[in-house]
Amino acid sequence: MSATAAASSSIAVATNSLRNVTLSSRSPLPSAISVAFPSRGRNTLQRRLVLVSCSTGDGSKPTILVAEKLGDAGIKLLEDVANVDCSYNMTPEELNIKISLCDALIVRSGTKVGREVFESSHGRLKVVGRAGVGIDNVDLSAATEFGCLVVNAPTANTIAAAEHGIALMAAMARNVAQADASVKAGEWKRNKYVGVSLVGKTLAVLGFGKVGTEVARRAKGLGMRVIAHDPYAPADRAHAIGVDLVSFDEALATADFISLHMPLTPTTSKILNDETFAKMKKGVRIVNVARGGVIDEDALVRALDAGIVAQAALDVFTKEPPAKDSKLVQHERVTVTPHLGASTMEAQEGVAIEIAEAVVGALNGELAATAVNAPMVSAEVLTELKPYVVLAEKLGRLAVQLVAGGSGVKNAKITYASARATDDLDTRLLRAMITKGIIEPISDVYVNLVNADFTAKQRGLRLSEERVLLDGSPESPLETITVQLSNVESKFASSLSESGEVKVEGKVKDGVPHLTKVGSFEVDVTLEGSIILCRQVDQPGMIGTVGSILGESNVNVNFMSVGRIAPRKQAIMAIGVDDIPSKETLKKIGEIPAVEEFVFLKL
Protein backbone atom coordinates (compact mmCIF):
# COMPACT_ATOMS: atom_id res chain seq x y z
CA MET A 1 0.00 0.00 0.00
CA SER A 2 1.21 3.52 -0.63
CA ALA A 3 2.21 5.77 2.25
CA THR A 4 -0.83 7.90 1.60
CA ALA A 5 -2.83 5.11 3.16
CA ALA A 6 -1.60 6.54 6.45
CA ALA A 7 -4.28 9.16 5.94
CA SER A 8 -6.93 6.49 5.88
CA SER A 9 -8.90 5.23 8.86
CA SER A 10 -8.88 1.67 7.57
CA ILE A 11 -6.16 -0.96 7.33
CA ALA A 12 -5.82 -2.79 4.05
CA VAL A 13 -3.64 -5.67 2.94
CA ALA A 14 -3.55 -6.94 -0.62
CA THR A 15 -1.38 -9.59 -2.22
CA ASN A 16 0.73 -8.87 -5.28
CA SER A 17 -0.84 -6.10 -7.39
CA LEU A 18 -4.45 -7.01 -6.81
CA ARG A 19 -5.34 -3.42 -5.95
CA ASN A 20 -5.60 -2.47 -9.62
CA VAL A 21 -7.48 -5.55 -10.78
CA THR A 22 -11.04 -5.17 -12.02
CA LEU A 23 -13.62 -7.89 -11.91
CA SER A 24 -14.80 -7.54 -15.49
CA SER A 25 -14.09 -11.18 -16.26
CA ARG A 26 -16.42 -12.39 -13.54
CA SER A 27 -20.09 -12.98 -13.90
CA PRO A 28 -22.44 -11.33 -11.38
CA LEU A 29 -22.80 -13.30 -8.17
CA PRO A 30 -26.30 -14.69 -7.77
CA SER A 31 -26.40 -15.52 -4.07
CA ALA A 32 -24.93 -15.13 -0.61
CA ILE A 33 -24.52 -17.52 2.32
CA SER A 34 -25.04 -16.00 5.77
CA VAL A 35 -24.18 -17.04 9.33
CA ALA A 36 -25.49 -14.94 12.25
CA PHE A 37 -23.84 -14.53 15.66
CA PRO A 38 -25.25 -12.93 18.82
CA SER A 39 -24.02 -9.37 19.40
CA ARG A 40 -22.70 -8.03 22.67
CA GLY A 41 -25.10 -5.15 22.43
CA ARG A 42 -25.15 -2.09 20.25
CA ASN A 43 -25.77 1.56 20.73
CA THR A 44 -29.39 2.12 19.81
CA LEU A 45 -29.49 5.86 20.50
CA GLN A 46 -31.83 7.47 18.03
CA ARG A 47 -30.78 10.89 16.78
CA ARG A 48 -33.20 13.65 15.84
CA LEU A 49 -32.39 16.04 13.02
CA VAL A 50 -33.36 19.56 13.96
CA LEU A 51 -33.60 23.08 12.68
CA VAL A 52 -34.43 25.33 15.61
CA SER A 53 -36.50 28.43 16.05
CA CYS A 54 -36.98 30.20 19.35
CA SER A 55 -40.21 31.82 20.40
CA THR A 56 -40.94 32.81 23.99
CA GLY A 57 -44.66 32.97 23.29
CA ASP A 58 -45.14 36.24 25.18
CA GLY A 59 -43.08 38.37 22.83
CA SER A 60 -40.14 38.76 25.24
CA LYS A 61 -36.54 38.50 24.06
CA PRO A 62 -34.61 35.23 24.21
CA THR A 63 -31.72 34.94 26.65
CA ILE A 64 -28.19 34.30 25.39
CA LEU A 65 -25.46 33.18 27.80
CA VAL A 66 -21.92 34.19 26.78
CA ALA A 67 -19.58 31.96 28.79
CA GLU A 68 -16.24 33.25 27.50
CA LYS A 69 -14.85 36.61 26.42
CA LEU A 70 -16.40 37.82 23.15
CA GLY A 71 -15.56 40.94 21.15
CA ASP A 72 -17.65 44.06 21.78
CA ALA A 73 -19.01 44.10 18.23
CA GLY A 74 -20.49 40.64 18.72
CA ILE A 75 -21.98 41.51 22.10
CA LYS A 76 -23.69 44.56 20.59
CA LEU A 77 -25.27 42.46 17.85
CA LEU A 78 -26.62 40.06 20.46
CA GLU A 79 -27.95 42.83 22.69
CA ASP A 80 -30.00 44.24 19.82
CA VAL A 81 -32.22 41.15 19.80
CA ALA A 82 -31.74 39.31 23.10
CA ASN A 83 -31.06 39.53 26.80
CA VAL A 84 -27.33 38.87 27.09
CA ASP A 85 -25.75 37.35 30.19
CA CYS A 86 -21.93 37.55 30.11
CA SER A 87 -20.73 35.15 32.82
CA TYR A 88 -17.09 34.13 32.47
CA ASN A 89 -14.97 31.52 34.28
CA MET A 90 -17.97 29.50 35.48
CA THR A 91 -17.50 26.10 37.03
CA PRO A 92 -19.31 23.20 35.32
CA GLU A 93 -21.81 23.19 38.16
CA GLU A 94 -22.51 26.92 37.76
CA LEU A 95 -23.01 26.48 34.01
CA ASN A 96 -25.44 23.62 34.54
CA ILE A 97 -27.52 25.75 36.92
CA LYS A 98 -27.58 28.85 34.73
CA ILE A 99 -28.25 27.06 31.43
CA SER A 100 -31.85 26.22 32.32
CA LEU A 101 -32.68 29.93 31.95
CA CYS A 102 -31.05 30.36 28.54
CA ASP A 103 -32.07 29.88 24.92
CA ALA A 104 -28.55 30.05 23.47
CA LEU A 105 -25.00 29.56 24.70
CA ILE A 106 -21.80 30.99 23.21
CA VAL A 107 -18.40 29.52 24.13
CA ARG A 108 -14.83 29.46 22.90
CA SER A 109 -12.52 26.48 23.43
CA GLY A 110 -12.29 26.67 27.21
CA THR A 111 -15.85 25.65 28.13
CA LYS A 112 -16.89 22.01 27.87
CA VAL A 113 -20.47 21.65 26.66
CA GLY A 114 -21.21 18.04 27.49
CA ARG A 115 -24.35 15.98 27.81
CA GLU A 116 -24.99 17.27 31.32
CA VAL A 117 -25.35 20.81 29.96
CA PHE A 118 -28.12 19.75 27.57
CA GLU A 119 -29.80 17.66 30.25
CA SER A 120 -29.70 20.60 32.67
CA SER A 121 -31.30 22.92 30.12
CA HIS A 122 -34.53 20.86 30.27
CA GLY A 123 -35.13 21.46 26.56
CA ARG A 124 -34.84 25.25 26.63
CA LEU A 125 -31.36 25.49 25.08
CA LYS A 126 -31.85 25.79 21.31
CA VAL A 127 -28.47 26.97 19.97
CA VAL A 128 -24.83 26.54 20.97
CA GLY A 129 -22.39 28.87 19.23
CA ARG A 130 -18.69 28.03 19.15
CA ALA A 131 -16.66 31.23 18.61
CA GLY A 132 -14.01 29.60 16.44
CA VAL A 133 -13.58 26.56 14.23
CA GLY A 134 -13.01 23.48 16.38
CA ILE A 135 -15.98 21.98 18.20
CA ASP A 136 -14.09 19.32 20.17
CA ASN A 137 -15.52 20.74 23.40
CA VAL A 138 -19.16 20.33 22.32
CA ASP A 139 -20.96 16.97 22.52
CA LEU A 140 -22.59 16.98 19.08
CA SER A 141 -24.49 13.74 19.61
CA ALA A 142 -26.08 15.07 22.79
CA ALA A 143 -26.84 18.41 21.12
CA THR A 144 -28.66 16.69 18.28
CA GLU A 145 -30.48 14.31 20.60
CA PHE A 146 -31.78 17.25 22.65
CA GLY A 147 -32.79 19.24 19.57
CA CYS A 148 -30.05 21.86 19.89
CA LEU A 149 -28.37 23.35 16.82
CA VAL A 150 -24.60 23.86 17.01
CA VAL A 151 -23.00 26.59 14.89
CA ASN A 152 -19.40 27.75 14.63
CA ALA A 153 -17.38 30.61 13.12
CA PRO A 154 -15.03 28.94 10.64
CA THR A 155 -13.92 31.82 8.41
CA ALA A 156 -13.09 34.88 10.51
CA ASN A 157 -9.72 33.66 11.79
CA THR A 158 -8.45 32.24 8.49
CA ILE A 159 -6.07 35.11 7.73
CA ALA A 160 -4.80 35.28 11.30
CA ALA A 161 -3.92 31.58 11.29
CA ALA A 162 -2.22 31.84 7.90
CA GLU A 163 -0.19 34.87 8.99
CA HIS A 164 0.91 33.08 12.14
CA GLY A 165 2.03 30.10 10.10
CA ILE A 166 4.15 32.32 7.86
CA ALA A 167 5.51 34.19 10.89
CA LEU A 168 6.56 30.94 12.56
CA MET A 169 8.17 29.68 9.36
CA ALA A 170 10.25 32.85 8.97
CA ALA A 171 11.15 33.00 12.67
CA MET A 172 12.21 29.35 12.60
CA ALA A 173 14.30 29.73 9.45
CA ARG A 174 16.19 32.70 10.92
CA ASN A 175 16.43 31.40 14.52
CA VAL A 176 14.66 34.49 15.84
CA ALA A 177 13.45 33.03 19.14
CA GLN A 178 16.78 31.40 19.99
CA ALA A 179 18.81 34.48 19.04
CA ASP A 180 16.48 36.70 21.07
CA ALA A 181 16.95 34.55 24.17
CA SER A 182 20.72 34.52 23.61
CA VAL A 183 21.04 38.30 23.41
CA LYS A 184 18.84 38.77 26.49
CA ALA A 185 21.15 36.37 28.32
CA GLY A 186 24.08 38.70 27.59
CA GLU A 187 25.50 36.75 24.65
CA TRP A 188 26.44 37.93 21.16
CA LYS A 189 26.83 34.77 19.03
CA ARG A 190 26.17 35.81 15.44
CA ASN A 191 27.73 32.73 13.88
CA LYS A 192 25.64 30.34 15.98
CA TYR A 193 22.35 31.62 14.61
CA VAL A 194 22.98 31.67 10.86
CA GLY A 195 19.66 30.80 9.23
CA VAL A 196 18.35 29.65 5.86
CA SER A 197 16.55 31.63 3.18
CA LEU A 198 12.95 31.02 2.17
CA VAL A 199 13.27 32.17 -1.43
CA GLY A 200 13.68 29.29 -3.86
CA LYS A 201 12.74 26.66 -1.29
CA THR A 202 9.88 24.18 -1.76
CA LEU A 203 7.00 24.44 0.69
CA ALA A 204 4.57 21.52 0.96
CA VAL A 205 1.17 22.56 2.29
CA LEU A 206 -0.59 19.50 3.74
CA GLY A 207 -4.27 20.37 3.80
CA PHE A 208 -5.31 22.86 1.13
CA GLY A 209 -8.41 24.36 2.71
CA LYS A 210 -8.99 27.99 3.59
CA VAL A 211 -5.93 28.45 5.82
CA GLY A 212 -3.67 26.30 3.64
CA THR A 213 -4.63 28.32 0.58
CA GLU A 214 -3.80 31.61 2.30
CA VAL A 215 -0.46 30.25 3.49
CA ALA A 216 0.32 29.21 -0.09
CA ARG A 217 -0.51 32.71 -1.40
CA ARG A 218 1.85 34.34 1.08
CA ALA A 219 4.62 31.81 0.54
CA LYS A 220 4.45 32.41 -3.21
CA GLY A 221 4.91 36.11 -2.47
CA LEU A 222 8.11 35.25 -0.59
CA GLY A 223 9.50 33.52 -3.66
CA MET A 224 8.89 29.95 -2.54
CA ARG A 225 7.82 27.08 -4.77
CA VAL A 226 4.59 25.75 -3.31
CA ILE A 227 3.16 22.26 -3.67
CA ALA A 228 0.16 20.90 -1.80
CA HIS A 229 -1.47 17.62 -0.89
CA ASP A 230 -5.20 17.38 -0.30
CA PRO A 231 -7.21 14.64 -2.04
CA TYR A 232 -10.32 16.82 -2.00
CA ALA A 233 -8.86 20.15 -3.13
CA PRO A 234 -10.09 21.25 -6.59
CA ALA A 235 -7.13 21.33 -8.97
CA ASP A 236 -8.35 24.52 -10.67
CA ARG A 237 -8.25 26.43 -7.36
CA ALA A 238 -4.68 25.31 -6.74
CA HIS A 239 -3.53 26.08 -10.26
CA ALA A 240 -5.11 29.54 -10.10
CA ILE A 241 -2.52 30.58 -7.51
CA GLY A 242 0.36 28.62 -9.00
CA VAL A 243 0.28 25.60 -6.70
CA ASP A 244 0.80 22.02 -7.87
CA LEU A 245 -1.25 19.29 -6.20
CA VAL A 246 0.90 16.22 -5.56
CA SER A 247 0.64 12.89 -3.78
CA PHE A 248 1.34 12.59 -0.08
CA ASP A 249 4.58 10.69 -0.75
CA GLU A 250 5.81 13.27 -3.25
CA ALA A 251 5.05 16.11 -0.86
CA LEU A 252 7.10 14.45 1.88
CA ALA A 253 10.01 13.55 -0.39
CA THR A 254 10.49 16.92 -2.11
CA ALA A 255 9.67 19.56 0.51
CA ASP A 256 12.22 21.79 2.23
CA PHE A 257 9.44 23.11 4.46
CA ILE A 258 6.19 21.38 5.43
CA SER A 259 3.22 23.36 6.77
CA LEU A 260 0.30 21.43 8.28
CA HIS A 261 -3.27 22.66 7.80
CA MET A 262 -5.36 19.51 8.09
CA PRO A 263 -8.07 18.75 10.63
CA LEU A 264 -7.55 16.27 13.43
CA THR A 265 -9.63 13.21 12.55
CA PRO A 266 -9.07 9.49 13.08
CA THR A 267 -7.53 9.42 9.59
CA THR A 268 -5.02 12.23 10.23
CA SER A 269 -4.10 11.46 13.84
CA LYS A 270 -0.28 11.16 14.02
CA ILE A 271 -0.03 11.29 10.24
CA LEU A 272 3.54 12.52 10.74
CA ASN A 273 5.22 9.60 12.49
CA ASP A 274 8.41 7.56 12.39
CA GLU A 275 7.44 6.01 9.05
CA THR A 276 6.56 9.29 7.33
CA PHE A 277 9.51 11.21 8.82
CA ALA A 278 11.79 8.58 7.27
CA LYS A 279 10.43 9.50 3.82
CA MET A 280 11.25 13.20 4.15
CA LYS A 281 14.22 15.06 2.73
CA LYS A 282 16.98 15.33 5.34
CA GLY A 283 16.95 18.79 6.87
CA VAL A 284 13.24 19.43 6.36
CA ARG A 285 11.58 22.11 8.50
CA ILE A 286 8.05 21.65 9.84
CA VAL A 287 5.39 24.19 10.85
CA ASN A 288 2.13 23.26 12.60
CA VAL A 289 -0.61 25.77 13.34
CA ALA A 290 -3.43 23.25 12.77
CA ARG A 291 -3.99 20.60 15.46
CA GLY A 292 -1.39 19.09 17.76
CA GLY A 293 -2.52 15.51 17.34
CA VAL A 294 -1.58 15.30 13.65
CA ILE A 295 2.06 14.90 14.70
CA ASP A 296 3.43 12.04 16.78
CA GLU A 297 5.37 14.28 19.15
CA ASP A 298 7.74 11.57 20.38
CA ALA A 299 8.53 10.64 16.78
CA LEU A 300 9.23 14.31 16.00
CA VAL A 301 11.79 14.46 18.82
CA ARG A 302 13.47 11.36 17.39
CA ALA A 303 13.48 12.90 13.89
CA LEU A 304 15.02 16.11 15.26
CA ASP A 305 17.72 14.20 17.14
CA ALA A 306 18.47 12.10 14.04
CA GLY A 307 18.85 15.19 11.86
CA ILE A 308 15.96 14.25 9.57
CA VAL A 309 14.05 17.31 10.74
CA ALA A 310 16.29 20.37 11.04
CA GLN A 311 13.78 22.55 12.87
CA ALA A 312 10.14 22.67 13.90
CA ALA A 313 7.80 25.56 14.74
CA LEU A 314 4.69 24.60 16.67
CA ASP A 315 1.64 26.55 17.81
CA VAL A 316 -0.41 23.52 18.83
CA PHE A 317 0.20 20.40 20.90
CA THR A 318 -1.47 17.08 21.62
CA LYS A 319 -2.05 18.22 25.19
CA GLU A 320 -2.40 21.92 25.90
CA PRO A 321 -0.63 23.33 27.73
CA PRO A 322 2.18 20.81 27.24
CA ALA A 323 4.15 19.50 30.19
CA LYS A 324 6.82 21.87 31.48
CA ASP A 325 9.47 19.18 31.02
CA SER A 326 8.33 18.28 27.48
CA LYS A 327 11.36 17.19 25.44
CA LEU A 328 9.75 18.64 22.35
CA VAL A 329 9.05 22.06 23.83
CA GLN A 330 12.52 22.26 25.40
CA HIS A 331 14.34 21.13 22.24
CA GLU A 332 16.82 23.78 21.13
CA ARG A 333 15.72 23.57 17.49
CA VAL A 334 12.00 23.92 18.19
CA THR A 335 10.17 27.26 18.23
CA VAL A 336 6.87 27.27 20.13
CA THR A 337 3.91 29.58 20.78
CA PRO A 338 0.86 29.00 23.02
CA HIS A 339 -1.86 28.39 20.41
CA LEU A 340 -1.88 31.94 19.04
CA GLY A 341 -3.10 31.11 15.52
CA ALA A 342 -6.35 33.09 15.83
CA SER A 343 -5.07 35.62 18.35
CA THR A 344 -5.19 38.95 16.57
CA MET A 345 -7.48 41.81 17.51
CA GLU A 346 -9.01 41.76 14.04
CA ALA A 347 -9.65 38.01 14.10
CA GLN A 348 -11.20 38.16 17.55
CA GLU A 349 -13.65 40.85 16.44
CA GLY A 350 -14.41 38.97 13.23
CA VAL A 351 -15.12 35.75 15.11
CA ALA A 352 -17.38 37.65 17.53
CA ILE A 353 -19.45 39.11 14.70
CA GLU A 354 -19.62 35.84 12.76
CA ILE A 355 -20.80 33.77 15.72
CA ALA A 356 -23.26 36.42 16.89
CA GLU A 357 -24.87 36.56 13.44
CA ALA A 358 -25.05 32.76 13.26
CA VAL A 359 -26.66 32.42 16.70
CA VAL A 360 -29.19 35.21 16.11
CA GLY A 361 -30.09 33.74 12.71
CA ALA A 362 -30.55 30.28 14.18
CA LEU A 363 -32.79 31.61 16.97
CA ASN A 364 -34.90 33.24 14.28
CA GLY A 365 -35.34 29.86 12.56
CA GLU A 366 -33.02 30.58 9.64
CA LEU A 367 -30.95 27.85 8.00
CA ALA A 368 -27.46 28.38 9.43
CA ALA A 369 -24.74 27.99 6.81
CA THR A 370 -22.24 27.20 9.58
CA ALA A 371 -24.40 24.56 11.30
CA VAL A 372 -22.33 21.55 12.32
CA ASN A 373 -25.14 19.18 13.22
CA ALA A 374 -28.23 18.20 11.30
CA PRO A 375 -31.29 20.34 10.56
CA MET A 376 -34.89 19.17 10.75
CA VAL A 377 -37.01 17.65 8.03
CA SER A 378 -40.70 16.96 8.40
CA ALA A 379 -41.50 14.43 11.11
CA GLU A 380 -43.39 12.19 8.67
CA VAL A 381 -40.52 12.01 6.19
CA LEU A 382 -37.93 11.49 8.90
CA THR A 383 -39.87 8.69 10.57
CA GLU A 384 -40.15 6.78 7.32
CA LEU A 385 -36.61 7.45 6.10
CA LYS A 386 -34.77 7.08 9.42
CA PRO A 387 -33.29 3.61 8.78
CA TYR A 388 -32.43 4.61 5.20
CA VAL A 389 -30.67 7.74 6.49
CA VAL A 390 -28.42 5.50 8.59
CA LEU A 391 -27.90 3.19 5.61
CA ALA A 392 -27.01 6.11 3.33
CA GLU A 393 -24.34 7.52 5.63
CA LYS A 394 -22.76 4.14 6.30
CA LEU A 395 -22.62 3.26 2.60
CA GLY A 396 -20.82 6.55 1.91
CA ARG A 397 -18.47 5.97 4.84
CA LEU A 398 -17.77 2.40 3.71
CA ALA A 399 -17.20 3.36 0.07
CA VAL A 400 -14.66 6.10 0.81
CA GLN A 401 -12.66 3.74 3.04
CA LEU A 402 -12.30 1.41 0.07
CA VAL A 403 -10.50 4.15 -1.87
CA ALA A 404 -6.71 4.06 -1.69
CA GLY A 405 -5.40 6.99 0.34
CA GLY A 406 -4.46 10.01 -1.72
CA SER A 407 -6.38 9.23 -4.90
CA GLY A 408 -9.29 11.46 -3.87
CA VAL A 409 -12.97 11.11 -4.70
CA LYS A 410 -14.26 13.48 -7.34
CA ASN A 411 -17.29 11.64 -8.74
CA ALA A 412 -19.99 9.74 -6.89
CA LYS A 413 -23.12 8.19 -8.35
CA ILE A 414 -26.09 7.31 -6.16
CA THR A 415 -28.75 4.92 -7.41
CA TYR A 416 -32.09 4.56 -5.63
CA ALA A 417 -34.16 1.49 -6.51
CA SER A 418 -37.78 2.04 -5.52
CA ALA A 419 -41.34 1.26 -6.55
CA ARG A 420 -42.33 4.85 -5.78
CA ALA A 421 -42.65 7.58 -8.35
CA THR A 422 -39.99 10.29 -8.33
CA ASP A 423 -42.32 12.88 -6.83
CA ASP A 424 -43.15 10.55 -3.93
CA LEU A 425 -39.56 10.00 -2.85
CA ASP A 426 -37.60 12.92 -1.37
CA THR A 427 -33.93 11.92 -1.50
CA ARG A 428 -32.35 15.19 -0.33
CA LEU A 429 -31.63 13.87 3.14
CA LEU A 430 -30.27 10.59 1.76
CA ARG A 431 -28.00 12.47 -0.63
CA ALA A 432 -26.81 14.67 2.23
CA MET A 433 -26.04 11.66 4.41
CA ILE A 434 -24.09 9.92 1.64
CA THR A 435 -22.13 13.14 1.17
CA LYS A 436 -21.57 13.17 4.93
CA GLY A 437 -20.29 9.60 4.87
CA ILE A 438 -17.88 10.31 2.01
CA ILE A 439 -16.45 13.59 3.32
CA GLU A 440 -16.41 13.37 7.12
CA PRO A 441 -13.90 10.50 7.55
CA ILE A 442 -11.20 12.65 5.92
CA SER A 443 -12.29 16.11 7.07
CA ASP A 444 -13.29 18.23 10.04
CA VAL A 445 -16.37 19.49 8.17
CA TYR A 446 -19.69 18.35 9.68
CA VAL A 447 -22.06 17.70 6.80
CA ASN A 448 -25.84 18.00 7.05
CA LEU A 449 -28.85 18.85 4.91
CA VAL A 450 -27.93 22.53 5.06
CA ASN A 451 -24.33 22.38 3.89
CA ALA A 452 -24.05 19.08 2.00
CA ASP A 453 -24.19 20.40 -1.57
CA PHE A 454 -22.05 23.43 -0.71
CA THR A 455 -19.42 21.27 0.99
CA ALA A 456 -19.35 18.80 -1.90
CA LYS A 457 -18.92 21.62 -4.42
CA GLN A 458 -16.22 23.26 -2.31
CA ARG A 459 -14.26 20.00 -2.26
CA GLY A 460 -14.72 19.26 -5.94
CA LEU A 461 -17.02 16.29 -5.32
CA ARG A 462 -19.65 15.81 -8.03
CA LEU A 463 -22.68 13.74 -7.07
CA SER A 464 -25.21 12.40 -9.54
CA GLU A 465 -28.43 10.60 -8.68
CA GLU A 466 -30.30 7.93 -10.61
CA ARG A 467 -33.72 6.41 -9.94
CA VAL A 468 -34.57 2.84 -10.88
CA LEU A 469 -38.34 2.34 -10.90
CA LEU A 470 -39.31 -1.13 -9.73
CA ASP A 471 -42.54 -3.02 -10.15
CA GLY A 472 -44.52 -3.81 -7.05
CA SER A 473 -46.03 -2.06 -4.06
CA PRO A 474 -44.68 1.39 -3.14
CA GLU A 475 -45.29 0.72 0.54
CA SER A 476 -41.57 0.73 1.31
CA PRO A 477 -39.78 3.93 0.21
CA LEU A 478 -36.68 2.14 -1.07
CA GLU A 479 -35.50 -1.31 -2.06
CA THR A 480 -31.76 -0.60 -2.36
CA ILE A 481 -29.26 2.26 -2.36
CA THR A 482 -26.09 1.92 -4.44
CA VAL A 483 -23.03 4.16 -4.13
CA GLN A 484 -20.40 4.14 -6.88
CA LEU A 485 -17.12 6.11 -6.81
CA SER A 486 -15.48 6.47 -10.20
CA ASN A 487 -11.94 7.33 -11.32
CA VAL A 488 -10.40 6.16 -8.06
CA GLU A 489 -7.82 3.57 -7.06
CA SER A 490 -9.20 0.91 -4.74
CA LYS A 491 -7.35 -0.64 -1.82
CA PHE A 492 -9.63 -3.69 -2.14
CA ALA A 493 -9.78 -4.87 -5.74
CA SER A 494 -12.92 -6.92 -5.18
CA SER A 495 -14.89 -3.75 -4.47
CA LEU A 496 -14.57 -2.72 -8.10
CA SER A 497 -17.55 -3.19 -10.38
CA GLU A 498 -17.25 -4.59 -13.87
CA SER A 499 -16.80 -1.00 -15.10
CA GLY A 500 -13.95 -0.36 -12.65
CA GLU A 501 -15.78 1.72 -10.03
CA VAL A 502 -15.79 1.21 -6.28
CA LYS A 503 -19.34 -0.03 -5.73
CA VAL A 504 -21.32 -0.87 -2.61
CA GLU A 505 -25.02 -1.58 -2.26
CA GLY A 506 -27.27 -1.88 0.73
CA LYS A 507 -30.85 -2.23 1.87
CA VAL A 508 -32.90 -2.05 5.05
CA LYS A 509 -34.14 -5.33 6.52
CA ASP A 510 -36.45 -5.22 9.53
CA GLY A 511 -35.33 -1.67 10.20
CA VAL A 512 -31.61 -2.55 10.18
CA PRO A 513 -29.16 -1.40 7.44
CA HIS A 514 -27.47 -4.25 5.58
CA LEU A 515 -24.59 -4.37 3.14
CA THR A 516 -25.79 -6.53 0.25
CA LYS A 517 -23.20 -6.11 -2.49
CA VAL A 518 -19.50 -5.24 -2.78
CA GLY A 519 -18.33 -4.80 -6.35
CA SER A 520 -19.91 -7.73 -8.18
CA PHE A 521 -20.09 -9.96 -5.10
CA GLU A 522 -23.31 -10.35 -3.15
CA VAL A 523 -23.00 -10.48 0.63
CA ASP A 524 -25.37 -9.93 3.53
CA VAL A 525 -24.00 -8.30 6.67
CA THR A 526 -25.43 -5.72 9.06
CA LEU A 527 -23.79 -2.31 8.86
CA GLU A 528 -22.98 -2.03 12.54
CA GLY A 529 -19.69 -1.85 14.41
CA SER A 530 -16.86 -2.69 12.01
CA ILE A 531 -16.49 -5.01 9.03
CA ILE A 532 -13.69 -7.17 7.68
CA LEU A 533 -13.94 -7.98 3.97
CA CYS A 534 -11.82 -10.88 2.65
CA ARG A 535 -11.41 -12.12 -0.89
CA GLN A 536 -10.54 -15.79 -0.68
CA VAL A 537 -10.47 -19.08 -2.48
CA ASP A 538 -13.77 -20.81 -1.65
CA GLN A 539 -12.74 -23.91 0.27
CA PRO A 540 -13.87 -25.79 3.39
CA GLY A 541 -12.89 -24.47 6.81
CA MET A 542 -12.40 -20.80 5.94
CA ILE A 543 -15.18 -19.55 8.22
CA GLY A 544 -13.77 -21.56 11.11
CA THR A 545 -10.17 -20.48 10.44
CA VAL A 546 -10.96 -16.77 10.39
CA GLY A 547 -13.38 -17.10 13.30
CA SER A 548 -10.75 -18.87 15.39
CA ILE A 549 -8.18 -16.13 14.81
CA LEU A 550 -10.68 -13.50 15.88
CA GLY A 551 -11.82 -15.55 18.86
CA GLU A 552 -8.27 -16.07 20.09
CA SER A 553 -7.88 -12.27 20.08
CA ASN A 554 -11.15 -11.80 22.01
CA VAL A 555 -12.80 -10.11 19.02
CA ASN A 556 -16.53 -10.79 19.04
CA VAL A 557 -18.09 -11.73 15.68
CA ASN A 558 -21.72 -10.70 15.31
CA PHE A 559 -22.34 -11.69 11.69
CA MET A 560 -20.62 -13.48 8.86
CA SER A 561 -21.62 -13.72 5.21
CA VAL A 562 -19.93 -15.46 2.28
CA GLY A 563 -20.74 -14.66 -1.33
CA ARG A 564 -19.17 -16.68 -4.12
CA ILE A 565 -19.14 -17.03 -7.87
CA ALA A 566 -19.38 -20.81 -7.79
CA PRO A 567 -18.24 -23.63 -5.48
CA ARG A 568 -14.44 -23.79 -5.08
CA LYS A 569 -13.99 -20.50 -6.94
CA GLN A 570 -13.40 -17.01 -5.56
CA ALA A 571 -15.58 -15.74 -2.73
CA ILE A 572 -16.01 -12.68 -0.54
CA MET A 573 -16.32 -13.15 3.21
CA ALA A 574 -17.90 -10.23 5.09
CA ILE A 575 -17.41 -10.38 8.86
CA GLY A 576 -19.12 -8.02 11.27
CA VAL A 577 -17.18 -7.48 14.52
CA ASP A 578 -18.05 -5.64 17.73
CA ASP A 579 -14.40 -4.98 18.60
CA ILE A 580 -11.46 -3.47 16.73
CA PRO A 581 -8.92 -6.19 15.89
CA SER A 582 -5.24 -5.49 16.54
CA LYS A 583 -2.79 -5.15 13.66
CA GLU A 584 -1.34 -8.51 14.66
CA THR A 585 -4.76 -10.15 14.40
CA LEU A 586 -5.38 -8.65 10.98
CA LYS A 587 -1.92 -9.73 9.87
CA LYS A 588 -2.75 -13.33 10.82
CA ILE A 589 -5.87 -13.19 8.67
CA GLY A 590 -3.83 -11.86 5.76
CA GLU A 591 -1.34 -14.72 6.14
CA ILE A 592 -4.01 -17.40 5.59
CA PRO A 593 -2.94 -18.96 2.24
CA ALA A 594 -6.46 -18.88 0.78
CA VAL A 595 -6.94 -15.16 1.56
CA GLU A 596 -6.01 -13.09 -1.49
CA GLU A 597 -6.76 -9.64 -0.04
CA PHE A 598 -8.67 -8.10 2.82
CA VAL A 599 -9.64 -4.74 4.28
CA PHE A 600 -10.81 -3.61 7.72
CA LEU A 601 -13.53 -0.92 7.73
CA LYS A 602 -14.74 1.17 10.66
CA LEU A 603 -18.36 2.29 10.45
Swiss-Prot record:
Superkingdom per UniProt: Eukaryota
One of the GO BP terms on file: L-serine biosynthetic process
Catalytic residues (UniProt): R291, E320, H339
Binding site residues for NAD(+): K210, V211, D230, V289, A290, R291, D315, H339, L340, G341, A342
Broad class of the protein's primary localization: plastid
GO molecular function ontology, one term from the record: ATP binding
Keywords noted in UniProt: Chloroplast, NAD, Oxidoreductase, Plastid, Transit peptide
Localization: Plastid, Chloroplast
Annotated Pfam families: 2-Hacid_dh, 2-Hacid_dh_C, ACT, PGDH_inter
Keyword NAD: yes
Tissue expression notes: Ubiquitous, but highly expressed in roots. Expressed in vasculature, root and shoot meristems, distal part of cotyledons and leaves, anther, stigma and pollen grains. Detected at the tip of the cotyledons in late embryos.
Phenotype of null mutants: Embryo lethal when homozygous.
Enzyme class: oxidoreductase
Transit pept. (range): 1-54
Annotated ACT domain residues: 531-603
Pathway: Amino-acid biosynthesis; L-serine biosynthesis; L-serine from 3-phospho-D-glycerate: step 1/3
UniProt-listed Enzyme Commission number(s): 1.1.1.95
Family: Belongs to the D-isomer specific 2-hydroxyacid dehydrogenase family.
PANTHER family for this protein: D-3-PHOSPHOGLYCERATE DEHYDROGENASE 1, CHLOROPLASTIC, FORMATE DEHYDROGENASE 1
NCBIfam families per record: PGDH
Role description: Involved in the plastidial phosphorylated pathway of serine biosynthesis (PPSB). Required for mature pollen development.
Name under which the protein is recorded: D-3-phosphoglycerate dehydrogenase 1, chloroplastic
Lineage of origin: Eukaryota, Viridiplantae, Streptophyta, Embryophyta, Tracheophyta
Gene from which this protein is expressed: PGDH1
